Design a protein with these regions (language model features):
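Residue-level recognition of pore/gate-forming positions within transmembrane alpha-helices
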Residues: 16, 69-73, 119
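Pore-lining transmembrane helices
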Residues: 47, 65, 150
Length: 171
């Protein structure tokens, strides 16, 4: 297997780690009828990055990167004494969302579309298990749908922009 440490894999790890940390460091922002969890600004990019890693190094390396990032973020959560539910929520949402993106992309769905679908799956699981009263409680039940909508909107907008920039300048 060829060496796979490059800008995409490093960014993938950084985005995932920072996305996990900002969840506890900052509270969600409410803008009108929607609530935007802090991880919204970062985690959407991990879905685009995993497709770039798959293009550059193949399916096995992209799978390995998903598991590496899961292990690193779980370790960080445990070391920082985050609640076990936050660790589990993060892990479950991340793995299901990333593998959804990877699988759709493998079967021919566009980079942007597969990333967006994976993000929606990730967000639903993450907000439900991690941010709601089941998890750390930063999103009360009455704001649940607004938080999912807020995170999905931010991630989809950012992914759409990033996908267009990538297609225009890096393809």
């Amino acid at each position: 297997m060829k060496k796979f440490v490059n800008i995409y894999t490093v960014l993938y790890l950084l985005v995932g780690i920072l996305g996990t940390l900002v969840t506890v460091w900052f509270t969600p922002i409410t803008v009108g009828p929607i609530t935007i969890p802090p991880s919204s600004w970062l985690m959407g990019f991990s879905f685009l990055l995993i497709t770039l890693i798959q293009d550059a190094y193949g399916s096995k390396v992209s799978e390995r990167m998903i598991w590496i990032l899961l292990a690193v973020t779980a370790l960080i959560c445990v070391l920082l004494n985050y609640t076990l539910m936050l660790v589990l929520a993060s892990g479950i949402a991340f793995v299901v969302g990333q593998f959804t993106t990877k699988t759709l992309y493998t079967f021919g769905t566009s980079r942007t579309a597969s990333s967006m679908v994976g993000s929606v799956v990730d967000v639903g699981i993450w907000v439900f298990l991690g941010l709601s009263p089941i998890g750390v409680g930063t999103v009360p039940w009455e704001r649940f749908f607004q938080a999912v909508l807020g995170q999905v909107l931010v991630q989809l907008i950012l992914q759409g922009i990033a996908g267009k920039v990538y297609d225009k300048y890096f393809k």
